[in-house]
C-alpha cells in the first residue's frame, strides 16, 4: 500500500509530462513575416483581441465605404502567406485586413492555438473593420485558408449579417484531419491517438463535432465559395464536396482548381473567379 501511495505523485508527474509533450508537439511553428504588401497603400495595425492579446495585421483601405475582407492564414502560417491575394482583390475594390492569428506571425502568444481561437480572432478583425471610416461595415466577408477556412465557416455559422465567405482548402472534420496527421507520424490511433484527440478537445473546450465544417455549414446563411486544390494531399478535395453536401439550400458554391494544399499555382488565373463571387455577394465600392 505504501508503495502505491508514494507512486501516485510520480505517476501524476509522468502523466503531466505526457500532456505537456502533446501540447508542445501540436503547437504551431511561429513564422514571422519578412515581406510587406509592396505597392499597396497599406498600414501596419495592432488590433486588440480576446484575452487582451494584440493581433498584428496589415490594413489596406480601398477608398471610402468599400466592402472589406478579413483574410486569415492556416496553421503555422502568417499574413505574408496570403499576400498573393492582396493586390488583385484590392484592385477589385475591396479593403483588406490581412491578420495574424494568436501564436502566429507577429501576433501575441497565448496558452494555445485552436480553430475556435482562430474564429475569435477573425471576429475581432471583423469588429475592427466595421468601425473604420474607409469601410462599409454592412458589407464584410472572410477569406480563410485551411484551419483559417474552418474558422471562417464557424464564424459564419454564428454571425448574422456576414456578407460572404471564401474557404480555401477547408477540412471537413478536425478529427479526420488529426487522424491523418497522426498516421503520417506513425502514431497508432489506439490507444495513443484516441487519447490525443480526447485531450485536445478537453484543452480547447470544444467537441470536434461542434466545430467541424461539415457540421457548422448547416448553420451558415451567407454565400460561401469553397475553393479546393484537386491535387491536395493534405485535405482531399472530396472533403470540400462533403462540406457542400451538408449545407442547407444553395448558399455554397464549389470551385475545384489545379493545385495542392498550399500552392494553387497561377493565382492570377483563379483570382478573377474569387473576385467575381465577392463582387456578386458584397458589391462594389461606393
Residue ranges and their predicted role:
Residues 2-48, 55-58:
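An N-terminal hydrophobic leader/cap segment in hydrolases
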Residues 86-108:
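Conserved alpha/beta-hydrolase
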Residues 112-133:
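Alpha/beta-hydrolase active-site loop
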Residues 134-146:
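Alpha/beta-hydrolase fold nucleophile elbow
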Residues 154-206, 215:
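Hydrolase active-site cap/lid region
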Residues 219-221, 226-228, 232:
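Short beta-strand/loop motif that positions the catalytic acidic residue
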Residues 233-239, 266:
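Conserved alpha/beta-hydrolase "acid-adjacent" motif
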Residues 260-271:
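Catalytic histidine-centered segment of alpha/beta-hydrolase-like enzymes
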Amino acid at each position: 500500500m505504501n508503495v502505491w501511495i508514494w507512486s501516485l505523485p510520480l505517476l501524476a508527474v509522468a502523466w503531466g509530462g505526457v500532456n505537456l509533450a502533446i501540447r508542445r508537439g501540436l503547437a504551431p511553428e511561429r513564422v514571422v513575416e519578412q515581406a510587406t504588401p509592396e505597392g499597396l497603400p497599406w498600414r501596419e495595425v495592432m488590433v486588440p483581441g480576446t484575452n487582451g492579446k494584440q493581433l498584428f495585421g496589415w490594413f489596406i483601405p480601398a477608398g471610402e465605404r468599400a466592402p472589406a475582407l478579413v483574410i486569415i492564414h492556416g496553421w503555422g502560417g502568417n499574413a505574408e502567406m496570403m499576400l498573393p491575394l492582396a493586390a488583385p482583390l484590392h484592385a477589385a475594390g475591396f479593403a483588406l485586413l490581412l491578420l495574424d492569428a494568436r501564436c502566429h506571425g507577429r501576433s501575441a502568444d497565448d496558452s494555445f492555438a485552436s480553430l475556435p481561437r482562430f474564429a475569435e480572432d477573425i471576429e475581432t478583425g471583423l469588429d475592427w473593420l466595421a468601425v473604420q471610416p474607409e469601410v462599409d461595415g454592412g458589407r464584410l466577408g472572410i477569406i480563410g485558408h485551411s484551419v483559417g477556412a474552418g474558422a471562417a465557416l464557424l464564424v459564419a455559422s454564428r454571425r448574422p449579417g456576414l456578407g460572404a465567405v471564401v474557404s480555401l482548402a477547408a477540412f471537413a472534420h478536425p478529427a479526420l484531419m488529426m487522424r491523418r496527421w497522426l498516421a503520417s507520424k506513425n502514431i497508432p490511433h489506439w490507444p495513443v491517438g484516441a487519447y490525443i484527440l480526447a485531450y485536445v478537445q478537453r484543452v480547447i473546450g470544444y467537441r470536434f463535432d461542434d466545430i467541424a465544417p461539415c457540421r457548422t455549414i448547416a448553420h451558415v446563411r451567407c454565400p460561401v465559395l469553397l475553393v479546393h486544390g484537386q491535387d491536395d494531399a493534405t485535405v482531399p478535395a472530396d472533403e470540400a464536396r462533403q462540406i457542400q453536401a451538408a449545407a442547407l439550400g444553395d448558399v455554397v458554391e464549389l470551385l475545384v482548381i489545379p493545385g495542392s494544399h498550399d500552392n494553387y499555382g497561377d493565382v492570377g488565373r483563379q483570382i478573377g473567379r474569387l473576385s467575381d463571387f465577392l463582387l456578386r455577394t458584397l458589391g462594389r465600392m461606393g
